[in-house]
């Protein structure tokens, strides 16, 4: 490709020099440059194509990421710096797409990057949400959800002339398609993220400051929000309509493209493979069968055989609440044709396996989506070794007995291009100098281990952390209005707010630490504890946990005895942009879910990659991190997954007994201290207090004492910075296992078989 001359481009586009352009116009210039470069990249065009269908893709800002993948980042940055401009400030004009929420969507985004980087033919397929999940605001120390209006300012969507009709029970809608280019790192070709929208969508249904809207106007509201509130019947129906709209478009696209590439559809499995990312796209199975039979004349049994050989399913959860189940009557209302096929598939499954535990439709006429995926897909994978073992041994054991050959593990991964090169350029430079640049494409960081006792390298690593903290402090001051001490230990838990992730346990530690400082035990370094994450609007206890955290933040900030030594910050509207600022700066990575409940996690990998030390239960991928780095380079605590499973099985966990221990009672009752309750919302605090005291379904009280002890050991160890940085380096050196390039290679070698 021709060399880049930004000075010449500035003259051509704006008739002025690069030095005289303001940052907004430079941003427009760079967007145009990236679009033109990407447009010259042909699409990957292998015979067999992957369709990675996901309800969410948390792609983050793309300008810098795409410049890295297109190989022009360093050249652009150098020219801008020479002209007196800061690329990071220019990037601030980019709007982050609101197409995802948490780990599921971020994983999908990392996977698309790796699929393209490995030169594989594969597109992501999802929906173009106009307002995303929601934009989070904090009002009176409580979460307020408002629409996330991002489409008006975006520069990344490219219109596609494909359009499809989706038939519902008593009406039909038309879709339109937009694409986002996905270049691969160091690759001449690209893939795409295909996002379907509703041609008749009406943004006017959404009032400006509320996420409440008419859920019955299906022909106008289908693509307004990701995960619309399903706490009522209309919300549940809307979810099903939305999921069927997504998969019907995906299936029609897949079949059209397969025919264009030469398929006669009897051989469709030679031309296409579908990866179902969690259960939201499950209806692609009956929809493909419907299209093959009614639109293309293939016999039902053959259509089932074809689909069974081309659909694979990734399970992302052990929580029963997250394994989607829908009333058959609701599916019949959304699409009678699809419901009829599901009934036939259920009859087939029951004829093959007379076991009610594996039925697709149970005795209550409820459809179990994961069961359909397992019976009528050819592969099911977990996303961490422990998670897969739990699926095989307990949660999905009846299926494992039937289909052991379908089960495999594919431990999650992250793209190093974004999470080092883009998010932490100082660390990327250190790695280049120490071990060469191959890590950018291979993900192999193991050569770094030989520098574990190299004083110069450790000092430089410490300097990268200082630089990352400075960037984070600037971000927090400008975007969050928070001043963080320059010498603070940065302790971070950023993830969806959920009881099983146990933000409430970290809040109890904060109360303990507050009281300890009040008693005169001042830490040598101030400790800043940072939270980030959203709670589902209908999830009351999660909302209460946010309120507790924000009230603690205010309470501590207003106490002159404690504020110099302890700070609590909750990032408003945590997203990929915030993650790219906070994760490189972290010293401590909080991965404290109840053992057996986190499928994998990926923030644990990002923190590890950026030199934070992990404080964790042995849950999800934490187990694999611990095995890689060794006991001396990680901090583990808590009941094991087997112990937790036994407590659930025999029903012997009693929060009340633990609550009555004086040390624990002191912490829990602080929540309802009259003065503290006067600072917050008494109803919320009382409800959370009572839930922890009397229920504590995810067993925060079981682990709190050992958690406090372990955390205090972490803070003490931080004082020996030489030893701390050695541990950080060993963590980075062992993070290569968690490259999404490795994960995708395994998916392809063992499941997809793309050329």
Can you describe what each PLM-predicted range is?
Residues 1-755:
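A conserved ligand/cofactor-binding region detector
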């Amino acid at each position: 490709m021709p060399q880049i001359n930004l000075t010449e481009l500035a003259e051509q586009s704006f008739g002025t020099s690069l030095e005289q352009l303001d940052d907004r116009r430079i941003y427009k210039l760079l967007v145009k440059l990236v679009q033109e470069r990407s447009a010259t990249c042909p699409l990957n065009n292998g015979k067999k194509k992957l369709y990675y269908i996901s309800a969410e893709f948390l792609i983050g800002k793309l300008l810098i990421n795409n410049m890295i993948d297109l190989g022009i980042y360093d050249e652009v940055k150098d020219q801008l710096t020479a002209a007196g401009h800061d690329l990071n400030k220019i990037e601030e004009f980019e709007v982050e797409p609101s197409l995802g929420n948490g780990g599921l969507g971020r994983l999908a985004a990392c996977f698309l990057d790796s699929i393209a980087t490995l030169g594989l033919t594969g597109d992501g397929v999802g929906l173009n949400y106009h307002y995303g999940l929601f934009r989070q605001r904090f009002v009176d120390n409580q979460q307020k959800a408002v629409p996330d209006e991002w489409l008006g300012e975006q520069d990344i969507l490219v219109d596609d002339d494909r359009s499809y009709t989706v038939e519902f029970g008593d009406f039909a809608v038309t879709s339109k398609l937009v694409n986002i280019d996905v270049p691969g790192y160091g690759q001449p070709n690209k893939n795409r993220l295909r996002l379907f929208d509703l041609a008749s969508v009406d943004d006017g249904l959404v009032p400006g400051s509320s996420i409440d809207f008419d859920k019955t106007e299906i022909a106008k509201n289908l693509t307004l929000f990701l995960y619309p509130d399903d706490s009522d019947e209309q919300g549940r129906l809307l979810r099903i309509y939305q999921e069927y709209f997504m998969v019907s478009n995906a299936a029609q696209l897949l079949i059209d493209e397969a025919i264009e590439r030469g398929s006669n559809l009897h051989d469709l499995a030679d031309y296409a493979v579908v990866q179902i990312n969690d259960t939201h796209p499950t209806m692609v199975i009956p929809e493909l069968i419907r299209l093959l039979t009614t639109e293309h004349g293939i016999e039902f049994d053959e259509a089932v055989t074809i689909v069974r050989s081309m659909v694979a399913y990734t399970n992302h959860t052990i929580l029963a609440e997250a394994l989607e189940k829908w009333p058959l009557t609701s599916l019949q209302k959304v699409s009678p044709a699809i419901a009829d096929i599901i009934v036939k598939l259920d009859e087939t499954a029951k004829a093959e396996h007379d076991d009610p535990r594996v039925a697709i439709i149970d005795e209550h006429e409820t459809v179990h989506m994961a069961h359909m995926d397992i019976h009528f897909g050819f592969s099911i994978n977990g996303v961490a070794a422990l998670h897969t073992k739990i699926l095989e041994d307990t949660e999905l054991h009846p299926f494992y007995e039937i289909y052991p050959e379908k089960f495999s593990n594919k431990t999650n991964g992250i793209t190093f291009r974004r999470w080092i090169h883009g998010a932490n350029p100082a660390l990327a430079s250190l790695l280049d100098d120490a071990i060469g640049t191959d890590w950018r494409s291979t993900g192999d960081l193991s050569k770094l281990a030989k520098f574990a006792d190299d004083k110069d390298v450790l000092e430089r690593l410490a300097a990268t952390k200082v630089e990352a903290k400075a960037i984070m402090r600037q971000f927090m001051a400008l975007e969050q209005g928070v001043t963080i001490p320059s010498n603070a230990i940065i302790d971070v838990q950023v993830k969806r707010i959920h009881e099983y992730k146990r933000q409430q346990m970290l809040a109890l530690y904060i109360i303990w630490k507050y009281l300890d400082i009040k008693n005169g035990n001042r830490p040598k370094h101030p400790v800043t504890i940072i939270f980030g994450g959203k709670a589902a609007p209908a999830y009351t206890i999660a909302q209460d946990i946010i309120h507790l955290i924000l009230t603690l933040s205010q309470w501590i900030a207003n106490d002159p005895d404690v504020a110099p030594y302890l700070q609590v910050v909750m990032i408003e509207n945590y997203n990929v942009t915030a993650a790219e600022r906070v994760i490189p700066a972290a010293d401590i990575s909080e991965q404290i879910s109840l053992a057996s409940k986190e499928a994998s996690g990926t923030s644990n990998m990002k923190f590890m990659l950026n030199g934070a030390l992990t404080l964790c239960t042995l849950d999800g991928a934490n187990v694999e991190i611990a095995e890689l780095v060794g006991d001396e380079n990680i901090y583990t605590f808590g009941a094991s997954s087997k112990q937790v499973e036994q407590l659930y099985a025999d029903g012997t966990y009693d929060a009340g007994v633990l609550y009555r221990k004086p040390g624990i009672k002191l912490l829990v009752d602080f929540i309802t201290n009259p003065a503290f309750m006067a600072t917050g919302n008494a109803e919320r605090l009382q409800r959370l207090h009572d839930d922890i005291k009397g229920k504590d379904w995810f067993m925060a009280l079981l682990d709190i004492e050992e958690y406090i002890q372990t955390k205090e050991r972490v803070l003490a160890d931080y004082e020996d910075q030489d030893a701390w940085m050695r541990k950080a380096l060993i963590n980075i050196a062992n993070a290569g296992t968690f490259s999404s390039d490795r994960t995708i290679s395994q998916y392809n070698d063992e499941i997809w078989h793309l050329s």
